[in-house]
From Swiss-Prot:
The species this protein was found in: Human herpesvirus 6A (strain Uganda-1102) (HHV-6 variant A)
GO cellular component terms, semicolon-separated: membrane
Domain Ig-like V-type: 23-135
Signal sequence, renumbered to the chain: 1-17
PROSITE patterns: IG_LIKE (PS50835)
Domain Ig-like C2-type: 146-236
Subcellular location: Membrane
Membrane spanning residue stretches: 268-288
SUPFAM superfamilies: Immunoglobulin (SSF48726)
Glycosylation site positions: N71, N104, N194, N202
Name of the protein in its database record: Putative OX-2 membrane glycoprotein homolog
Main localisation: membrane
Cysteine disulfide links: C41-C125
Residues in the Extracellular compartment per record: 18-267
Amino acid sequence: MSSLMLRLLPLLYIISAHFVLHPETSPSLIYEIGSIVTFHCRLETTTNIRSVSWYNKNRLISNHEVQNMDNLSFTDDGYVLIHELNKINNLAVDSKLYFHIKHNRTTSLLKIKAKSAYDATCLTCTFTVDNEKTSATSCLKLFMKPIVVLYFRYLDNFLDVTCTVTSYPKPNVVIKFLGEVYKRDIPIVRQNENGSSTVSVNFTFKRRTKLEFVGKTVSCLASSWFTNQKASALVTSGEHTVQNHDEYSKEGVKSSNSDETVFTWTVPLILILISVIVLLISVCIVAFKS
């Protein structure tokens, strides 16, 4: 062996000794509140793994110690080494560790049920390989689809419309009526126990005649993060409540109310048709008597 190779051997040993694989994980997870969330962390090796740990900030929440892999019996798909239950802020944590010998891969799975918006958090998984530690962090984002409730009633000569929406994050709420969009700069907002917000918007519309608004479409439109929901109803002569989870396009907010246009043209045509029928019947009766 040459003198150059002899001098390079210590350097190669130092480099190889400090070369550590980095875990693979999803940096960002998006789930709906109430879902079971799965954090996963994978390392492309099954050699010399001493432990796999999960941390919530600096607090240890799950730890798998690997004592002696030689005594483990592996299946073709992998072997579940430890099944562990723990707590994160009173949340049940279901943690499992898999060794996939065929693929030379170690995977750690950690499951929680996200009950509220406050369960959104970042978890860090740490693999200890020999005496080296290598980590990766995954952050959870939560959302709640808007629950939309539309209510209207008459107060003397006014149509009173209230739109109430519950979602997370806090929704933007508008009322659409007679082709116009109405919103409040400062709506009524209530915070709920699960971290969601309930936003209420109210408007009154003066009617010139008793039946002016009957048959017109009134809609409650809500947008929260990437989700749009609405509730719509035809105005009646009394009070009415409707709850809906239909999705809508934001373009619909800008467009005219097609339902009202159809109603505006349909009613006069029906009245004209009825008048013609009555006139024909009258002519027939007169002709028959004569």
